[in-house]
Design a protein with these regions (language model features):
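Aromatic-anchored glycine-rich loop motif in surface-exposed flexible loops
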Residues: 1-66, 78-93, 97, 245-248, ...
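An aromatic- and glycine-enriched ligand-binding surface/loop that stacks and positions planar moieties
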Residues: 41, 49-50, 64, 68, ...
Length: 291
């Protein structure tokens, strides 16, 4: 429901577990029997508050949501609830509650291995299969695993266009490319500080095509080092695969998706067969970090 609000606003109906059990395609109104609007934010907060109040600190099953993951998600929802995402009600103020919850999570939170939350040693570590799951920084993950033998593990119910999201050069289908705006937001000044005035939006693209349709990247521009963990760029190493130097084999349609490559959730070539699927190389054991 939280993700639906992000996309469509708070007018989406609230479908609870009971309605789903009674009907696989429930028809749910966003008003109650008296015609009053059902405020979906309150329903989401109520659900997460119950989880935060009642879940244990840790579970023996590593991937289950514990008290601290629920608390962090509750705080995130309350932040969005107090923002323009809440439409005309975006002036509602839950920041004091958010601060209280997050102070509790920071002071006392731990993962299911009992590791107290902390910042990972490096940003890259968060997106390295086998290391990223239990750095202490991951609060709420979508768990992932591969056997090394099962084919098409990235495809839920045959959803090919979702599963093959990696760069073409790594076995993906080239979808979900980083945008110009996202990449330019990593431009920094000589002191390593971001351009807080949004002037990066008017800066030239860091990667361009020459008259022969060959891609080039301007590496003289100062950028936040996290950029090359998140985004593949031409003329820079793409993990341990190779250095992309031509469109062919890397970009599906440059006129549609641009020149940047999906990278941070893509497995390394060395992972193939152990932390990545043997047949579809972009299937990976990297967890997806929600928080």
């Amino acid at each position: 429901h939280f993700e639906l609000i992000k996309l469509y606003g708070a007018a989406v109906p609230y479908v609870d577990d009971i309605a789903m059990k009674e009907n696989v395609n429930p028809q749910v109104s966003n008003v109650d029997e008296n015609g009053n609007y059902i405020y979906i934010w309150d329903k989401i907060v109520e659900d997460l508050q119950f989880a935060y109040d009642n879940l244990p600190d840790t579970w023996t099953e590593a991937g289950r949501v514990n008290k601290w993951a629920a608390g962090a998600m509750l705080a995130k929802v309350k932040m969005y609830q107090s923002s323009p995402y809440n439409g005309k009600n975006g002036t509602s103020n839950h920041w004091t509650e958010v601060k209280t919850i997050l102070e509790d999570v920071i002071a006392n939170g731990k993962d299911n291995k009992g590791t107290k939350f902390r910042l990972a040693d490096t940003y890259e570590e968060l997106y390295t299969a086998g290391e990223s799951d239990w750095t202490g920084e991951s609060v709420f993950d979508v768990q992932a695993a591969v056997s090394g033998t099962v084919e098409q593990t990235a495809n839920i119910n045959g959803a090919w266009h979702i599963g093959f999201s990696g760069a073409l050069g790594t076995g993906g289908w080239g979808f979900y490319q980083p945008s110009y705006d996202m990449v330019n937001a990593h431009i920094v000044d000589a002191n390593g500080l971001p351009k807080m005035d949004d002037s990066y939006r008017n800066d030239p693209a860091l990667s361009t095509l020459d008259e022969n349709n060959l891609p080039h990247t301007d590496l003289t521009v100062y950028t936040d080092p996290r950029l090359d963990v998140s985004t593949g760029r031409f003329e820079t190493p793409f993990l341990d695969w190779t250095v992309p130097n031509a469109l062919d084999g890397w970009v599906r349609d440059v006129s549609n998706g641009g020149l940047y490559l999906n990278k941070k959730n893509i497995p390394r070539k060395a992972d193939k067969g152990s932390l990545s699927n043997t047949t579809q190389t972009n299937s990976t054991a990297k967890n997806f970090h929600l928080i």
